[in-house]
Amino acid sequence: MKRGYIIITIISLLVFMSCNNSNNNRTYPEGEINFTIVETTDIHGMIFPYNFITDKEENTSMAQVSTYIKKLKDEGKTVLLLDNGDSLQGQPTVYYYNFVATNEPHIWSEVLNYMNYDAVGVGNHDVEAGHNVYDKIVKEIKAPLLSANLVDEKTKNPYFKPYTIIEKNGVKIAILSLIEPAIDRQLPKVLYEGLATEDMVESAKKWIKTIKEKESPDIVIGLFHAGANYTEDKETFKNENASQLVAEQVDGFDIILVGHDHQGWSGLGYDETTKQKTKEVKSPSGKVVPIFGGVNAARFIPSIDVSMIYTNNAWDIKFKGELIDVSKYEADKEFLDNFDSSKKAIQTWVSRDIGNLNTKLTSDDAMFGDSYFLSFIHKLEFTIAKEELGEDVDVSFAAPLSKDAVLNNGVVRVRDMFSLYPYENFFYVMKLTGKQIKDVMEYSYDRWFNTMTNINDHLIAFKKDANGELIFNNRYNSYDTVTPSYNYESVGGINYIVDVTKPRGEKVTIESFTDGRPFELDKEYKVAINSYRGSGGGGHLSQGAGIDLKTLQNMDLVLKATDKDLRYYIIDWFEKQNGAITVEKLNNWKVVPEDYVEAGKKKDYKLIYPNN
């Protein structure tokens, strides 16, 4: 993590030859103008320095951010305070106000207003909360809620404000916000009914032109809920992480603030050759565009001092920024006192007993093959499909949504459900052919497991740099895998074998259904699946099974869907059980050759879990 200062000087190329009449008559401020930009992003409900899931104190939260903001203001600095989205999913803090205490003002709205935010961007996980939540938030917060490329399907007009103009010390600041556009393959349509996303580069070109012609701002800030490393081919339409692509392909931005990737950016962009954050990013005209972005859960936040001098009909703009380690600041007592009643209400809710387990469940075993953890998820999906949707499904899909999940034996509480199932996914019963199911499995296991040529090879498919070396992720203190664990899709209801010595497309051998029925490639089956996967998330159904993305978005293959998230039904299931629950492993699949697997697991476990 780079924490040192980086100083970038930008000579603005705006000579204002095309400014409107009102701007020609404008009197510009004299001398050096200063203000400080602070961005929070991907807070994911970390409002208090306390983890409601683990029941442990934390050293970063919005309470510490509040202390830092007060410090800046006490120093006499003018602060431009921005949030970049993904706040409405994660901790039970926001879930409680999203779906339980819905008649009360949302705690996130209250926090934004308390801290006097200037503008707020929209993230994909904010959209995931659904219309009822974000339509309420936009009415409650004082700051404008922004997103230029989340548009009305019919009119193509932005659903939220596309940009805002803010004045600080006489400087006219334009803030254009964009959301990562891949939500149409990540989220069920019901969560953003009537809306669509536009490609970030295309949207930026359109709106930067409008802003320049209509507003004639002194400085333009991109507030993008998307990562800087484009991860796929840079020409990918609706690229999920196109922030740096916008900087490199669209003139007009002075600085870009990013989110979504949780990586932390301190001025420099991603160098695709070295795979490091070392690239000086330049616009098409050659202007340096610094990229800053925070780390999730308020761990690190960008703080950028801006100095501007208007001379010779142009602005000389300098940025001096760093990533602030929020853990070095105490929680703001006034902040905590103000929201104490909310914290107590959430604490009471998450501490509620809902059942008892005889079996300890951990997701680390699920990273390497059949496990008690995934067996439990599969059984829950079969049960929920039957009891809530009235469907006897043939197959279930499930993945370890977190590689670090632990559900201890003993009393089970509401908070434990956020470890077992961390995302607000809905639940579908879909119709898929046997071939499509098989293709999904091949796609999953090809990205999950390496193709082993000898017993010394890696079992897990790890990312590699240009030199063929594994890539260590300092933030997670482990080596990066080709795809996250939440894409490690396994299957219930079928007996099958995964051979890691076989090439792509030939790893999976399906023997039969677990009830003895033959599995037929040309026959249609009912499949239990979460809404992320069913909407195209991870590419299993689109790239793996070759199903058109629009078909998935329109839910054409969905027979039935829940109207609440899976976690709600899992909590309900626990509360209906009598006595302690013993989980049995399904034992319906295995990875071979066993000696290769055992050797690979022993080696790779240390790379994924170096602290265990």
Enumerate the predicted regions with their spans.
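C-terminal motif of bacterial Sec signal peptides marking the signal peptidase cleavage site
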Residues: 15-18
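Acidic, metal/ion-coordinating pockets
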Residues: 20-324, 328, 373, 377-380, ...
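Intrinsically disordered, low-complexity regions enriched in Ser/Pro/Gly/Gln/His and often acidic
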Residues: 9-12, 582
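Residue-level detector of alpha-helical recognition elements and their boundaries
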Residues: 8, 135, 271, 452-456, ...
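Catalytic centers of hydrolytic enzymes
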Residues: 26-36, 45-55, 59-74, 186-201, ...
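Short secondary-structure capping/junction motifs at helix and strand boundaries
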Residues: 2, 145-146, 392
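Sec-dependent signal peptide recognition
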Residues: 2-10
